[in-house]
């Protein structure tokens, strides 16, 4: 590598970026500036999302009042930027509105103490009270009721969707939620005209629900990366991802996009939703204006309206790898100046390694690419301190091979098991595996995480070999981040804390390497576990599965060393018990009589 040339390019880029893709002008009134940039509809939607993510228990109508107040104030500032209060920061304006809520202390307890602080501490305080698992009722779509609401007031319907999703997902990527709200309204526009509204609506809502949950999990991981491991972690992730998507783009261009994208995500994670959406729009414009040097796959995206354009760019397929790329070993193992180049600009050199590796390997997971970069960095730290560094680091690529082999072997083992057991059976196998590893974790969390992990089979094992690793590893990163977020709220296991906090990129290998916890003291047998009533018979299949899986976790917490045969016997007895009583004429009487018998047979089987 001509390192002097590279450093010159980097310095040139740094100078250019001081002007930036995003506008850096100062404005007399920030709220007026954002209102003019975003337009009234998007402004109101983003403000509604912001309030819903902070005040997750407030009724919709209360939020609408807050949104209308702030919107009217923004219009006043657009008309006259020197009007009293228009010069205040957005954090100050939002915080003042939150602190005016009469029921703040009664509904949110300690959160009300945030109002005694000054900015920026007040906003940090509000952020710390966001609840990743709020106690809110499940949303159960009733096609006829929803169509009536949609026809009565489309705007309110759109707002209600933003509110319901935002308060359940307090870190949802706000501009992306606007996109999904528009799509949601589009589904109702189509299906409420249909003869069979349910047949049209329900499959579309379910498909969309899966996409929304995945989008929420991706943003939660980004926010956790910044919160727990700093901006550098998110930048590294973005370098790998964008280098895979845009392999023809120069490293300096990728670095520029990464810096801007990190700023956008940092703003949204920090609750600065107006700035985040505005800057995301600017970034989409920049990418489209420069698509010739970024990717040949962008044209279709760039012809779309703003929200669809940004979504499309985020989801765009990977461009073809440029032809005749030199082997990686030339610059990163064979070159005798590797240590000199590394020590002169460590982050830039490692960034270029990650860029070059990622653009050549679209079939690798981002997390695997980051592990490779981390191991490469550790090798250079060790080798560059030796008398003959080149002899030490020249074989580094042989040492990195195991980091690719390990996930490939694990994926094969798990996909083989999935094909043998099916999704539900695979989930149960994971419940057994993870309950034995971390039995201190709450039963609902173990069930939720194991069910999600089990879906990786359906999602990824049917894909071609070239797509299996990114699908599996990156999906597992999202699920394990959910476990880490929930565990942080009520930490109960040192093993989980260690895996969650030591290294972001090594979380999955850390959890995979956990062994059954031999120090765990089993729970006493709880007869209430087998106290059921007739209402179980009318539950949807998914909820019935969750009931059975909850029982399985509790059995393992009582008898962690139960054999596969014992567990199989108990679960078969349990299923037979439910089936028998649900077929009985007097279901409630059957559950009352057969329940105690099941307790006895379970205790006998586990003895």
Curated annotation (Swiss-Prot):
Signal sequence coordinates: 1-18
Binding site for Cu cation: 27
Transmembrane portions of the chain: none
InterPro entries: ALB/AFP/VDB, Serum_albumin-like, Serum_albumin/AFP/Afamin, Serum_albumin_CS, Serum_albumin_N
Record-annotated disulphide pairs: 77-86, 99-115, 114-125, 147-192, 191-200, 223-269, 268-276, 288-302, 301-312, 339-384, 383-392, 415-461, 460-471, 484-500, 499-510, 537-582, 581-590
Pfam families: Serum_albumin
Glycan attachment sites: 151
Record-listed N6-succinyllysine modification sites: 228, 587
Entry GO terms, CC: cytoplasm; extracellular region; extracellular space; protein-containing complex
Coiled-coil segments: none
PTM per Swiss-Prot/TrEMBL: Phosphorylated by FAM20C in the extracellular medium.
GO terms assigned for molecular function: DNA binding; enterobactin binding; fatty acid binding; metal ion binding; pyridoxal phosphate binding; toxic substance binding
Similarity comment text for this entry: Belongs to the ALB/AFP/VDB family.
Record text on subunit structure and interactions: Interacts with FCGRT; this interaction regulates ALB homeostasis. Interacts with TASOR. In plasma, occurs in a covalently-linked complex with chromophore-bound alpha-1-microglobulin; this interaction does not prevent fatty acid binding to ALB.
Biological role: Binds water, Ca(2+), Na(+), K(+), fatty acids, hormones, bilirubin and drugs. Its main function is the regulation of the colloidal osmotic pressure of blood. Major zinc transporter in plasma, typically binds about 80% of all plasma zinc. Major calcium and magnesium transporter in plasma, binds approximately 45% of circulating calcium and magnesium in plasma. Potentially has more than two calcium-binding sites and might additionally bind calcium in a non-specific manner.
Record's protein name: Albumin
Recorded name of the encoding gene: ALB
